[in-house]
Regions:
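A contiguous loop/helix-start segment that scaffolds small-molecule binding in enzyme catalytic cores
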Residues: 18, 184-254
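Conserved beta-strand scaffold positions in the cores of enzyme catalytic domains, especially
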Residues: 18-20, 71-73, 141-143, 170, ...
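A short, acidic, amphipathic alpha-helical segment used as a generic capping/interface helix at domain edges
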Residues: 100, 105, 175-183, 197-206
Length: 254
């Protein structure tokens, strides 16, 4: 990577590289050997965070950060009062991602590599993908795979998820109730992400699909404060960002 930040043969500064590093589900010990090496070597580290809160990605990577690295915090806009399917929500996030691109691009054009920390895997429901889509045509981008958040939840819940020829479906809970119920009914096993303010709707969809009795609720899987229970036993409809619902498969076994 250092060669990317050097001077080219004609004396013009070479462009830097964007390095997306997957951090795994939350436990720093689930950071891969390669990710730890890349983080430790990074001169510029960027990470997403909610304004006024510690970055979860930075907290995971903290044991591996070089003490003299430059840090760039990318603070999400406050969108909790705007429904995700409204134009204002999309426009707010679009402006945010364009601002992030501007900041990162300035570093890359100056010949500096930027390591962008990503919870879970960089290419699964991650903000890194928005940087990748906007910068890939001009800059070199390296991607270090991470243990997915769902894998961390499988292990935390001690749930075999897909047997034999089971079909495993990954769903965002932001879908409308009818689509959730339909998808849950037609698959063998499911992972439902982005529970947030969608838990009551998901519960209803699972009852309609006939899977509520085998659904597992995992909150903060592979993180401090981990909670695991049968979904039907959860008494309230509050679900934080770091929560998932699992519907284990029951397919062919030897």
């Amino acid at each position: 990577m250092n060669a990317l930040a050097s001077t080219s043969r004609d004396g013009v500064a070479a462009l830097g590289a964007l390095i997306g590093v997957g951090l795994g589900p939350g436990d720093p010990e689930l950071v891969t050997v390669k990710a730890a090496r890349l983080i430790g070597a990074a001169k510029v580290v960027a990470f997403f965070a909610k304004r006024g809160r510690e970055s979860h990605a930075r907290a995971i990577a903290a044991p591996y950060l070089a003490p003299d690295c430059e840090e760039i915090a990318l603070h999400y806009p406050v969108t909790t009062e705007i429904p995700f399917d409204q134009p204002e929500y999309v426009e707010s996030l679009q402006r945010f991602y364009e601002d992030c691109v501007t900041r990162i691009r300035a570093m890359l054009e100056a010949g500096r590599d930027v390591t962008l920390l990503c919870e879970g895997d960089p290419l699964l429901y991650g903000s890194f993908m928005h940087m990748f889509a906007r910068l890939d045509q001009r800059f070199r981008i390296e991607i270090c795979a991470g243990v997915s958040g769902m894998s961390g939840c499988f292990a935390a819940a001690r749930q075999p998820m897909a047997w034999g020829d089971d079909i495993l479906t990954v769903l965002p809970a932001t879908l409308d109730e009818d689509r959730l119920a339909s998808r849950l009914a037609e698959t063998d096993a499911a992972v439902v992400m982005k529970l947030g303010g969608n838990f009551a709707k998901l519960r209803r969809a699972m009852i309609r699909a006939g899977v509520i009795d085998r659904a597992i609720y995992v909150e903060r899987g592979a993180m401090p404060g981990e909670k695991i229970m049968r979904l039907k036993d959860k008494r309230d409809d509050d679900a934080p960002y770091f929560s998932m619902a699992l519907v284990p498969g029951r397919g062919r076994r030897p």
